[in-house]
Amino acid sequence: MNDSSKPLTQRRHLLTVGAAVAAALAGAGAAYWQSKQEQAETPRMPITGDLDELWQMQFDKPDGGKLAMQSLKGKPLLINFWATWCPPCVEELPLLERFYNQNKAKSMQIVGLAADKPEAVRTFLKKLPLTFPIGITDLSGIALSKSWGNLAGGLPFSVMLAADGHVMQRKMGKLSEDDLNIWQNAV
């Protein structure tokens, strides 16, 4: 290598390193932005679905019969939309089960609305039995959740109703124990 090619080689090396650093910074910035977006609670927006209609709804129960939403009216109610094919939904169900068992005597209610096929829900509940009420909505549950503020139509999606039926909280994404405690204290 002659002396005249050394500066060119050094310049290429510096450009390569500079490009790598810029790419790393851009990637880190994008990852940070995405993590903040995922942590953000569902934006507040008016609910287009008529909550009065909610109390008239009935859903098939996994073991047969109907889950009448009217039977849950008048107490704080957490409605959780989930599906057996949704990993975050499945991960949060044991937390919801624990929370339900700790709080059912305190008039706190939970209902799970499975946006799934009835047979898939029945099979799933044999492996992970739940004691809080479950209704099966098929895929129409996703449209229902959208009318209550689930802009993306993603699962899991949870809505917390006060005893008088007004919406207190909403979240698209997996609930945490902190979420549940905050929501419970708000009612």
Where are these regions (language model features)?
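Aromatic-flanked redox-active Cys/Sec active sites in thiol-based oxidoreductases
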Residues: 80-86, 115
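C-type cytochrome heme c attachment motif
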Residues: 84-91, 157
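A short beta-strand-turn-helix
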Residues: 56-77
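Conserved hydrophobic/aromatic "anchor" residues
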Residues: 57, 81-82, 124, 132
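Active-site acidic short loop of glycosyltransferases
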Residues: 72-75, 105, 131, 153
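Thiol/disulfide oxidoreductase modules built on the thioredoxin-like
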Residues: 127-130, 138-185
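N-terminal targeting signals for export/organelle localization
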Residues: 1-56
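Structural microenvironment flanking redox-active thiols in thiol-disulfide oxidoreductases
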Residues: 91-129, 139-145
